[in-house]
Amino acid sequence: MGLCVAATTGTIVAWIACGTLCFCYTRLIDGRNKKIWLLTLFLLALTGCIYTRTWADAVAVLGMLLLWLAIKVHTDGKYHPTWKDRPDGRYVRSAAPIAVITPFIMPDRCGANILFDESVEITELDRYVRAKRRAGMPSFGMTHAIIAAYVRTVAKYPAVNRFVAGQRIYARDEDIAVCMTVKKEMTKDSPDTVIKVHFHPGDTIQEVYDKFNAAVLSAKDEMENSGVDDAAGILTSTPRLVLRFVVWLVKLLDYFGIAPKFLLELSPFHGSVYLTSMGSLGIKPVYHHLYDFGTVPAFIAFGRKRRAEEVHDGEIVERKYMDLRFNLDERICDGFYYASVIKYFLRLLAHPEILDIPPETIEKDIP
């Protein structure tokens, strides 16, 4: 009886020690406590077990010691992936309690979306586009300007680059993944595919132009052999039950944040924002739904240019506008933050010359 009690006590102590170590470890490497004294005190406490010659606990001490020696403390001041992080995002540990609870109240992205529309006067933007084409960017268009404006907006308001997965909030930090559907030719029978282009918050309009054009050209050249289409083709060739199981399995892995990185990169449903150009189709922008699968928290659609007559200084003047429609996941940031994001985004489109130079500072999201 005494041996059983001793063994049970030793097991409980070992589990408590392991839990304490994990707690100290996560607090140390996620930046909430940058001193090593927590681990040092814990090691001293375990060393006491060896001093008292309680050999049943000595094995646990050795195991804990090996774990302690395996802990890698980073002193470069940068964030390093740790517990609860995903391959495509960092877990936001200091989010407000209401923000943490919200994904449990509204678990689906389509049930947490907000719709917003805005118009931007594009006289200056039109001039800017024409100037860029004359300056050696022959294919420069509104799409490049909108992407660059969004990238610069993330540099100032990084919380808009978050996403919700597995009912947790994650931050992409300096990786901005822009998704867009492209067609090889503007005909109804031409195949289409999805491109995903990665940008950095410090990118200028020139870097955005180069990265986006390279991705579009690559997609059009390899339209018949794109990774997204190949993967979809393999899945659709299987029986429905198999396909349903595969999709369920991918969703399960994605929920727990353990889906392989290559799969997340292939998926058109995982990214920072999805853009769609209705202007190239000659129609007004639509309110496009968000996807419950994946991580994309924002959908931005922009339509054809339109003219409007207005009264200015007692005279009727004609101005050109472009309409934009947003579908946003309200769980990643609050309404005040979103309002600031939209206003800054529109200001950049009204004064696109700002995008020619790198941002003075790149704001960091909360830990």
Residue ranges and their predicted role:
Residues 3, 9-17, 21-367:
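C-terminal catalytic/motor cores of large multi-domain enzyme assemblies
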